[in-house]
């Protein structure tokens, strides 16, 4: 190793030693500062006037729970002052030794433990001092609270005494609880003045709770007593009185246990008085509600029968008239059927329908007569009679609807006859008009499609007239043939217009094609074919298609122009 390298090594070692010394001095100073701060905190805690506070509470000569609480907190202070502070002192001395011997990690760990110990002692001392302060102040605090409680109690006593009649069976139990609260006040005074304010505070808490609970009871009882002793019995008496009057007026009821339900309600009132007496107010309120529901149910029964009686009277007054009206309608229907049977073949269902209705009306009449005859001495509840009579009314309404339906069908027969005769005459005239209309067109011939439709329509119109001339007209057959003839006439009219339209347009297009025939062989050829179809086959639609297709090639849109012009000036068939 060269001299230069040796010098560098020695310098590096010297620098490291200097740095190590500086670090050691820094750590030692820092630990010393922390130890001094902990020593100051320990002294501050130790010098707190806890002993004086303990002596002050001890001189109060506490007893009972207060004395037990004091002893516990005093013992805790003794343990802290004798043991915990000594442990901290030893740990401080040990940490200083570690720090002076440059064992900085152990010193730092020891300092951390001391900080935790001092923090715990600080919290314990604070708890001890707060507890001692509470014990010292408890008596005066109790004195302030008891005045408020006494005011509430005296107000409660005064309210009960002035309104004793409102509490009914509950009065004895309320007064008993007032006496118990009075005893609790006496017990509180004894404990608070004899050196046990903690136990006295517990007694005062209970007393305040009892006062509040009893106040709540006193608030609720009058309404419950009024309901149970006055309102519900009055309602029940009114119900009983009303029930007797209804019975005297020959009312009957579906329910057969009404008397028993009255008795059960009176028994329920008596039993619920016991709930009031024992201050079981929730039960009393529930039972009152149940009784009210039962009374309402009975009231609904009576009002139902009273309302039903009025409905029954109205139905008994109107149903006979309604029934008589329907019998008259049925007689008229029978007369209509007899009259129509002289001219028309009516289905047997019409007559049998009227006969069935007549039978049903007779049975309904017997039922109405029976109910009416029993009204002087009714044997059923009016609600039952109401249901039966309303059912009878509904059935009569259904029968009336049937009568209306039959009447409409009978009336429609004559209307259909008149309509068919009018249509037959119209169709005969239309056939003649269409024939003349076609003849005036001077067509080279009539297409077979037209002739077939014309003769079919003519034959069906003739069939319709034959049906109408029968001695006994079958209106169903007439209606069927009329529908066929109507469809034929519509088809014939449509075909007539089509034939005339295509024939006329074909003639116009053939004439218009003359301007192209001299130089357009294709149009000349189409002209010849279209003319041949027109004059020999009489298929005017095909002839129109042939010439129009050729002209469209030479002059697009020409066909539409002719069609539009024709539709504006087309001659209609004048029927």
Swiss-Prot record:
Which top-rank group of organisms is this from? Bacteria
InterPro entries in alphabetical order: EzrA (IPR010379)
Task: List where the protein spans the membrane.
Answer: 9-27
Provide the alphabetized UniProt keywords: Cell cycle, Cell division, Cell membrane, Coiled coil, Membrane, Septation, Transmembrane, Transmembrane helix
Topology, Cytoplasmic side: 28-575
Q: Which GO terms describe its biological process?
A: division septum assembly; septin ring assembly
Classify the main location: membrane
Q: Where in the cell is it found?
A: Cell membrane
Residues assigned to the Extracellular compartment are 1-8
According to the UniProt entry, the coiled-coil residues are 110-191, 265-301, 354-416, 456-526
Membrane topology summary: Single-pass membrane protein
Pfam families attached to this UniProt entry: EzrA (PF06160)
> Under the cellular component aspect of Gene Ontology, which terms does the record hold?
plasma membrane; septin ring
Cited function: Negative regulator of FtsZ ring formation; modulates the frequency and position of FtsZ ring formation. Inhibits FtsZ ring formation at polar sites. Interacts either with FtsZ or with one of its binding partners to promote depolymerization.
State the similarity comment: Belongs to the EzrA family.
Designated name of the protein:
Septation ring formation regulator EzrA
Q: Which organism is it from?
A: Streptococcus pneumoniae (strain ATCC 700669 / Spain 23F-1)
- State the organism's lineage: Bacteria, Bacillati, Bacillota, Bacilli, Lactobacillales
Gene name per UniProt: ezrA
């Amino acid at each position: 190793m060269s001299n230069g390298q040796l010098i560098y090594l020695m310098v590096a070692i010297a620098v490291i030693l200097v740095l190590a010394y500086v670090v050691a001095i820094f750590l030692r100073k820092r630990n010393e500062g922390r130890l001094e701060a902990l020593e100051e905190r320990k002294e501050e805690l130790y010098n707190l006037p806890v002993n004086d506070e303990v002596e002050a509470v001890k001189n109060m000569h506490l007893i009972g729970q207060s004395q037990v609480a004091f002893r516990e907190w005093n013992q805790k202070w003794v343990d802290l002052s004798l043991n915990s502070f000594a442990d901290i002192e030893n740990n401080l001395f040990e940490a200083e030794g570690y720090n002076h011997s440059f064992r900085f990690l152990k010193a730092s760990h020891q300092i951390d433990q001391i900080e935790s110990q001092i923090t715990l002692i600080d919290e314990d001392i604070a708890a001890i001092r707060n507890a001692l302060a509470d014990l010292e102040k408890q008596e005066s605090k109790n004195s302030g609270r008891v005045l408020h409680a006494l005011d509430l109690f005296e107000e409660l006593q005064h309210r009960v005494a002035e309104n004793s009649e409102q509490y009914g069976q509950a009065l004895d139990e309320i007064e008993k609880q007032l006496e118990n609260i009075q005893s609790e006040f006496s017990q509180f005074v004894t404990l608070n003045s004899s050196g046990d304010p903690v136990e006295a505070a517990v007694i005062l808490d209970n007393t305040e709770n009892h006062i509040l609970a009893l106040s709540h009871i006193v608030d609720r009882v009058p309404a419950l007593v009024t309901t149970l002793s006055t309102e519900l019995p009055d309602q029940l008496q009114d119900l009983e009185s009303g029930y007797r009057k209804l019975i005297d007026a020959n009312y009957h009821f579906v329910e057969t246990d009404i008397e028993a339900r009255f008795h059960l309600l009176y028994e329920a009132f008596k039993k619920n008085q016991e709930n009031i007496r024992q201050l079981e107010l929730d039960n009393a309120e529930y039972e009152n509600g149940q009784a009210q529901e039962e009374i309402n149910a009975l009231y609904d029964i009576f009002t139902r029968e009273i309302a039903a009686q009025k409905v029954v009277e109205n139905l008994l007054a109107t149903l006979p008239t309604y029934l008589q009206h329907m019998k008259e309608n049925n007689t008229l229907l029978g007369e209509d059927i007899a009259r129509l049977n002289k001219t028309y073949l009516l289905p047997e269902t019409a007559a049998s329908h009227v006969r069935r209705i007549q039978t049903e009306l007779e049975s309904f009449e017997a039922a109405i007569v029976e109910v009416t005859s029993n009204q002087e001495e009714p044997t059923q509840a009016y609600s039952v009679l109401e249901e039966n009579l309303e059912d009878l009314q509904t059935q009569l309404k259904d029968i009336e609807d049937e009568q209306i339906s039959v009447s409409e069908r009978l009336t429609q027969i004559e209307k259909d006859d008149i309509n068919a005769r009018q249509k037959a005459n119209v169709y005969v005239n239309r056939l003649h008009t269409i024939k003349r209309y076609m003849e005036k067109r001077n067509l080279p011939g009539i297409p077979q499609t037209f002739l077939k439709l014309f003769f079919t329509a003519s034959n069906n119109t003739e069939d319709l007239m034959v049906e109408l001339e029968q001695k006994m007209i079958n209106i169903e057959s007439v209606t069927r043939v009329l529908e066929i003839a109507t469809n034929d006439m519509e088809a014939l009219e449509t075909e007539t217009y089509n034939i005339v339209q295509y024939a006329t347009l074909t003639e116009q297009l053939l004439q218009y094609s003359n301007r192209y025939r001299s130089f357009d062989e294709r149009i000349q050829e189409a002209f010849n074919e279209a003319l041949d179809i027109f004059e020999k086959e009489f298929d005017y639609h095909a002839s129109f298609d042939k010439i129009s297709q050729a002209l469209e090639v030479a002059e697009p849109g020409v066909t539409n122009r002719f069609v539009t012009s024709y539709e504006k000036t087309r001659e209609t068939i004048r029927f």
